[in-house]
């Protein structure tokens, strides 16, 4: 019989479990927060599939980096994945602007091509590529505490995976604050942005670069498929609660905490994979927001602003 109290305290019953699970929770929070902040602008631009495209598009970059270096060390993998992610984004933008293809068709064509190329390269036996496709797709956040320790100037500084994700999360937050107005205006009205002298193309590629960095940093923990859930669920859920984009952005932090803690306890209770449990928790939180949210919920009469409807009435600050 299910016991709620036992389910909640089982994950924290010993000192070792507390240390182990805190690392998993912090990793989940940073992944979800980073993906959610970027996802706010991706969803506003009606390009939710872009996260999925870049997530799949980084696979050939990872494999090629391994084939060239024979190592899965952080540096080569990040460089290869970022180049592949930017290449995927550039291909999508080129197809969208230079051909009659719609955005969804351009993204679908590009990410399937990149992902297929990655699978073909992964199947090659050159150098005995020790990459598990299941790990790339689904990740294993539960192994975060086993990551190598970061050593600087001979001093141990803690879990390297947490440091890597922490730096990316910090960069994402700083970029969101510094470039907020540019991202907002270019997301809702590119004509206005051009009339104000904003470099629309540079901002678009900058967002793709940030997206690629977040995806690369996250794929080992939650896998490329679940990155999309972490990227879409926070902004979409909070859009039913708030009418202003700054509030939607701020809500990403408490939602990330709920996803991470809720997913961990769900995994302990049902013996599910932790990363999938975090995504399920996100869906469970989304449902009441969608049904009863004050900003366009199914059972409310207020009109939904915002993140789904474009630029009507959205304040810039």
Predicted regions and their residues:
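Transmembrane helix-bundle core of multi-pass membrane transporters
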Residues: 115-175
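Helix-loop-helix "hairpin" substructures at the membrane interface of multi-pass membrane proteins
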Residues: 157-229, 233-234
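Cytosolic-side transmembrane-helix boundaries in multi-pass membrane proteins
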Residues: 275-317
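Short loop segments and helix-boundary regions at transmembrane helix junctions
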Residues: 41-131, 238-250, 267-270
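Structural signature of hydrophobic alpha-helical transmembrane segments
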Residues: 19-32, 74-86, 165-170, 216-229
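Hydrophobic alpha-helical transmembrane segments
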Residues: 25-30, 78-83, 105-109, 162-167, ...
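Transmembrane alpha-helical segments in multi-pass inner-membrane proteins
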Residues: 217-276
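Membrane-interfacial amphipathic/re-entrant helices at transmembrane-helix boundaries
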Residues: 1-34
């Amino acid at each position: 019989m299910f016991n709620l109290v036992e389910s909640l305290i089982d994950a924290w019953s010993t000192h070792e479990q507390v240390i182990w699970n805190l690392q998993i929770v912090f990793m989940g929070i940073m992944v979800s927060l980073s993906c959610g902040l970027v996802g706010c602008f991706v969803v506003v631009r009606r390009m939710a599939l872009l996260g999925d495209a870049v997530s799949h598009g980084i696979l050939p970059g990872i494999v090629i980096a391994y084939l060239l270096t024979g190592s899965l060390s952080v540096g080569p993998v990040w460089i290869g994945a970022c180049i592949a992610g930017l290449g995927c984004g550039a291909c999508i933008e080129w197809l969208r602007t230079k051909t009659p293809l719609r955005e969804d068709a351009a993204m679908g064509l590009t990410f399937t091509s990149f992902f297929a190329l990655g699978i073909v390269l992964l199947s090659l036996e050159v150098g005995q590529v020790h990459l598990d496709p299941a790990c790339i797709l689904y990740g294993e956040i539960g192994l975060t505490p086993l990551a190598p320790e970061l050593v600087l100037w001979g001093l141990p500084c803690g879990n390297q995976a947490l440091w890597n994700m922490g730096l990316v999360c910090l960069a994402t937050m700083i970029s969101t604050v510094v470039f907020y107005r540019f991202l907002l205006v270019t997301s809702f009205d590119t004509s206005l942005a051009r009339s104000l002298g904003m470099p629309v193309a540079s901002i678009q590629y900058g967002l793709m670069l940030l997206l690629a960095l977040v995806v690369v940093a996250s794929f080992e923990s939650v896998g490329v498929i679940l990155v999309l859930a972490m990227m879409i669920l926070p902004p979409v859920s909070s859009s039913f609660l708030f009418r202003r984009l700054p509030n939607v952005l701020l809500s990403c932090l408490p939602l990330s905490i709920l996803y991470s803690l809720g997913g961990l306890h769900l995994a302990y209770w049902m013996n599910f994979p932790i990363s999938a449990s975090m995504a399920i928790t996100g869906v469970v939180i989304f449902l009441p927001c969608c049904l009863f949210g004050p900003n366009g919920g199914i059972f409310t009469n207020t009109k939904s602003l915002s993140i789904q409807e474009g630029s009507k009435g959205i304040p810039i600050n």
